[in-house]
Each structure stands twice: as structure tokens, then as C-alpha cells.
A protein has these predicted regions:
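Short hydrophobic "helix-edge" motifs at membrane interfaces and signal-peptide entry regions
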Residues: 7-8, 70, 201-202
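Short beta-to-alpha loop/turn elements within the nucleotide-binding domains of ABC transporters
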Residues: 54, 100, 212
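Hydrophobic residues in alpha-helical segments
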Residues: 32, 91, 284-288
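Short, surface-exposed loop or secondary-structure junction motifs
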Residues: 3-4, 104-315
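Active-site SXXK
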Residues: 22-29, 48-50, 74-105, 110, ...
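Short, conserved catalytic-motif segment at the N-terminal edge
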Residues: 12-75, 95-97, 111-119
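Short secondary-structure junction motifs
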Residues: 37-39, 93, 97-99, 180, ...
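N-terminal pre-domain segments of enzymes
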Residues: 1-11
Length: 315
């Protein structure tokens, strides 16, 4: 694959110490030799130039298939920024407001309850109270919605999440939201930062406000304009795909979703413990660049400042 970013002749040209880059390479090789990881691709860029682009180890250790700079990885929760920028694009276009109640787009969230003392492991009953204020789109973007992951909350709320089968891979985004609408939040909206399903719900907001499926919005409005040809949802080129290594304890390779099929549930923010929905190679650095530098036109400067700004004092 071609990288359109120029290469630095020497790391020092962009203010990086070559001996420290060598330490990174040595550390990775050591971890690969010890079996901690099967392989890795490292890309370090600074001042608009690539200072380091190197592949280490194997993309499939059991098949002894070497890692390459254009190996495709499942990027798990790195899908979150794509979903968040999609929402910011719609906000820029006036199709949603960050201050809007989520219930404006998802009526299922109009009368949510909040679990009381949800983290208490000794609680005997899942007590609930009304929301003190409505959940907003801004809450979804900054993970202050009160939504969580089942494994990050107390036993009673975890049991409720699992009973509702929130992580069902056969469901649609709309079906997932309908289930969440029947469950209490872990915290009052705006009161607590909690990594969780906020971005999954934001993905459904994008679908409603944008009038199309989340995966199609991301591909057509973000990936194609940026030239991210190897980034998307769905089929992965098996000849370039990184594979999980065999679990030494079981002797089995961890199961992976069949990427030859388009999933019904386009989950934009699955945690690292689950399979990812999106795939990408080292061109992901172009995405990072375009969300940080003014030359990107995926979002206007004021919106980019909101994306990378601090939000803990905003309510």
C-alpha cells in the first residue's frame, strides 16, 4: 500500500531520538519472542512526516504468516471516534444539537429510571429513582449518560443487562436501544463519567438524525472522502488480516465473528473484550491527522475544538 505522508530521512529530522525508537523495537521483539503478542505494526509520525513504520512478528503466528505494514486489524473501540465525529458532522449541519435530549431521537429513552446505589455488591434489590434531568446527546459523547457495560457495574444491574441480552450480535441498533429503554441507568445523567454503551446509543442517534445506517454513514461521509479504502464494516481480506493467537490455556484460537457477513448490529463502541466491527490498516494515522489539523473538512474548526476540548465543567 502507498502512504502519502512523506518519510523523514532520519528520526532526528522531526525531533525524535533514534536510540529511543530502537528501544521500542527491541521491547516489541522481546514480547514477540516470549509469546506475549504475535506481532505488531508501529507507525510514528511527527511534524507531517513518518519517522517510523515497521512491522514485527506475525499476523498469524500459527501459520507463520509475517506481519506487514498493510495488515488489517479489527480496531475495536477505536470505532468510537468515527461515530462521535459522525454525530458532530450532523450537529454542524443542524440535524441535531448537542444539548438535545436523547429522547428527541430515541423515544424509548423518554422516561428512563436510574438505579440507586448500583455499584453496591451487597444490595438485595435493584432500587430505582427518576432521572433528575434528561440524558443529552452531549452526555453520550462524553460518557456521562449513565449507561454502562454490564461487567463494569454492580451484580444486580449486571444481571438485568445480561437477562435482556444487550450484547446480542443478531440484534439491530434499534432493537438494542429498545432493550436499554427498559433498563435503569447506572448513574444520573451528567453526574458520573462511565465508559460504556454511550457511543452505541449515539450510533443509533446518528442513524435517526442522518437517515441512514451507521456503517453506511461512516463509509460514505468519512472513510471515502479521506481515502480510507481499507477501513470499514464487514468483509476483511483474509490474506491481509491479523489473526488472534491460540490461547495457551485451552489450545484454541479465540472465536471471531464471520466478517464475510454484514452484521445486523453495527455496534460502534464495543469494548476491547469483544470483537471489533471496523477494520483498518496503518492509514488510520490519516484519520488521526484529519481530526487534529485544520486542513480536514470533515468538521469545522469550532466543532473540532469541541471534540478535543475539555468538558468536565459543562454540567
Amino acid at each position: 500500500m502507498a502512504f502519502d505522508m512523506p518519510r523523514a530521512i532520519r528520526p532526528a529530522e522531526v525531533g525524535l531520538a533514534p536510540e529511543r525508537l530502537n528501544r521500542l523495537a527491541d521491547a516489541l521483539k522481546n514480547d514477540i519472542d516470549k509469546g506475549f503478542v504475535p506481532g505488531a505494526v508501529v507507525l510514528i509520525a511527527r511534524r507531517g512526516k513518518i519517522a517510523c513504520l515497521e512491522a514485527f512478528g506475525y499476523r498469524d503466528r500459527e501459520a507463520r504468516a509475517p506481519m506487514a505494514p498493510d495488515t488489517i486489524f479489527r480496531i475495536a473501540s477505536m470505532t468510537k471516534p468515527f461515530t462521535s465525529v459522525a454525530a458532530m458532522m450532523l450537529a454542524e449541519e443542524g440535524k441535531l444539537l448537542l444539548a438535545d435530549p436523547v429522547a428527541r431521537y430515541l423515544p424509548e429513552f423518554a422516561n428512563l429510571k436510574v438505579a440507586v446505589d448500583s455499584d453496591n455488591p451487597s444490595a438485595k434489590k435493584l432500587a430505582k429513582e427518576p432521572m433528575r434531568r434528561e440524558m443529552t446527546v452531549h452526555d453520550l459523547l462524553r460518557h456521562t449518560s449513565g449507561l454502562t457495560y454490564s461487567h463494569l457495574t454492580g451484580p444486580l444491574l449486571k444481571k438485568a443487562y445480561e437477562a435482556a441480552n444487550i450484547a446480542d450480535e443478531k440484534q439491530t441498533n434499534a432493537e438494542m436501544v429498545a432493550k436499554l429503554g427498559e433498563l435503569p441507568l447506572a448513574y444520573q445523567p451528567g453526574s458520573t463519567w462511565q465508559y460504556g454503551l454511550s457511543t452505541d446509543v449515539l450510533g443509533r442517534v446518528v442513524e435517526v438524525a442522518g437517515g441512514t445506517d451507521l456503517d453506511r454513514f461512516i463509509i460514505e461521509r468519512i472513510c471515502k472522502p479521506l481515502g480510507l479504502a481499507d477501513t470499514g464494516f464487514g468483509p476483511i481480506d483474509a490474506a491481509r488480516s491479523a489473526q488472534p493467537q491460540v490461547d495457551p490455556a485451552s489450545g484454541n484460537r479465540p472465536p471471531m465473528r464471520d466478517t464475510a457477513l454484514r452484521p445486523k448490529w453495527i455496534a460502534p463502541a464495543v469494548g476491547a473484550h469483544r470483537e471489533a466491527e471496523a477494520k483498518a490498516d496503518a492509514k488510520l494515522r490519516r484519520w488521526r491527522q484529519c481530526t487534529e489539523q485544520d486542513r480536514s473538512r470533515r468538521a469545522a474548526p469550532d466543532f473540532r475544538r469541541q471534540v478535543i476540548g475539555r468538558h468536565e465543567r459543562n454540567g
